[in-house]
């Protein structure tokens, strides 16, 4: 591909130098518009058709979809543009200055995962777009680190249906084909406070929560008995009761109690199914104490994800890398992209470096990642 792009390391440097933090704290949260425009300019310069879309319900956040080649199917290479915030006191380098030392590239987003776009652009130097028989898409999303709003919106609104997708999260170039989902909720009981000398004049929220927890533990057993997937180390959905707070003094009837819990569902269990099971489990408490129990989301939920084990994407990637696909415990945008086409999570850098001070990617990943991207484009866009 004829290119007027900067060298690989300069692409990387520019990506890292462009802050794109997403955070639930509005004081730390930033727009990714500058970074999206940077990517859109580069892909546009080398002949891609580029669309930049605002993500509804966000504060100045954008997705970018770049396409080259015509027809149906093809390959989608995807990644998120945002990073987590950084702890200034724990970094020994400037997070926004790409620093090379001891065969490592340091900077916020080097591994997770802005650098992936530099790898894609670099691999495209060897691709002749006139030889593509199917389209190549590149997706850059917003807010993966917080709400996954970018990937959700894209999966719900796009018309494209590639043959397959690869999300370039840092997996140390080990292909990942499944992970559990995550749903976290606050269960809040509103009681009636009063002096402990006369329990009849109050409603003790801790006692009601005790009832609620007993029903939740029954649900935990139900999840274990009803759902099973042997590819996971723990082959059933898990439930954790992680935080509880209620009351303020030994001599007062507790007026309010709140429990924070999570469920990690298997692939195939919908978020609506989980919501229904949770509401059904707590219904006896709600019915006995009308208006006193509420369930709310702590974080936007993420479904489980599994790429079909017999799909060509898996066999091609396993053969190229000489390694088998893996199952992981963390969550990605894969369940949303998977609604469009079979999806693998596969990229350079280690997940151990993600969200860490002095985040880095080992330069040993550069050559094999470039080769892998070229090979998958050849496999899925030339045939």
UniProtKB/Swiss-Prot annotation:
Superkingdom as given in the UniProt entry: Bacteria
Residues at the active site: 82, 144
Binding site for Zn(2+) 1: 80, 112, 169
Cofactor note: Binds 2 Zn(2+) or Co(2+) ions per subunit.
Pfam families xrefs: M20_dimer (PF07687), Peptidase_M20 (PF01546)
Location(s) in or outside the cell: Cytoplasm
CDD domains linked to this entry: M20_ArgE
Pathway note: Amino-acid biosynthesis; L-arginine biosynthesis; L-ornithine from N(2)-acetyl-L-ornithine (linear): step 1/1
Stated family: Belongs to the peptidase M20A family. ArgE subfamily.
PANTHER family in the record: ACETYLORNITHINE DEACETYLASE
Subunit structure: Homodimer.
Described function: Catalyzes the hydrolysis of the amide bond of N(2)-acetylated L-amino acids. Cleaves the acetyl group from N-acetyl-L-ornithine to form L-ornithine, an intermediate in L-arginine biosynthesis pathway, and a branchpoint in the synthesis of polyamines.
Protein name listed in UniProt: Acetylornithine deacetylase
Species, as recorded: Pectobacterium atrosepticum (strain SCRI 1043 / ATCC BAA-672) (Erwinia carotovora subsp. atroseptica)
Gene (name only): argE
